[in-house]
A protein has these predicted regions:
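PLD/PLD-like phosphodiesterase catalytic module centered on the HKD motif
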Residues: 1-180
Length: 180
């Protein structure tokens, strides 16, 4: 993702469909998302406890009063201060919560399908039939430490990048159907 995002400044959106989302994956990917305006993640069959907690709490105050937001953030701060997380995890949690609160990150679990696909769509805000800088990456990598190759116990992953506009549009249309 680093090279792709650094060399394609017009890319402003990341949509992903993954079977597994691990905090380690989001925390690793996050430094490269500063130029991205919107991240939408559709999660399939497994979400770890950090993601579940952040997402559930985030949904509690979307559209709610400012007082509820502040109460939750105070509660989260106490939880983190009293935990044994590393500073990397703590920073990642704060960034993830901030991304959820700001609307930069949206997480959904599909209500009826057990999703196993791994698809990453990167495209500009004005993506259309004439766009040349969008891409779809599909393969075996979930958004996890293993999937991104950062874990000690690395596993073989195989992914393919599709750049033809028709392929990207097809993947984007499929994502929108699942997201709806």
């Amino acid at each position: 993702f680093e090279g792709l995002l650094e060399n394609n400044p017009n890319i402003k959106n990341l949509d992903s469909v993954v079977g597994f989302l691990r905090a380690s994956g989001y925390f690793t990917l996050r430094p490269f998302l500063n130029s991205i305006n919107k991240v939408r993640m559709l999660i399939g069959i497994d979400v770890d406890k950090y993601i579940v907690k952040a997402n559930n709490q985030g949904h509690l105050f979307f559209g709610a009063e400012e007082e509820v937001k502040q109460d939750y953030l105070t509660q989260l701060r106490k939880d983190i201060e009293n935990s044994v997380y590393s500073s990397h995890v703590e920073e990642g949690i704060w960034q993830m919560v901030d991304d959820l609160v700001s609307g930069k990150l949206e997480l959904r679990a599909h209500p009826s399908k057990k999703i196993h696909a791994k698809i990453y769509l990167l495209y500009p805000d004005n993506f259309n039939e004439w766009s040349t800088d969008g891409c779809a990456i599909t393969g075996s990598s979930n958004l996890s430490g293993n999937g991104l190759g950062i874990s000690q116990d690395k596993q073989y992953e195989f992914n393919v990048m599709l750049r033809d506009n028709e392929d990207v549009q097809f993947a984007k249309d499929e994502f929108e159907l699942l997201w709806a």
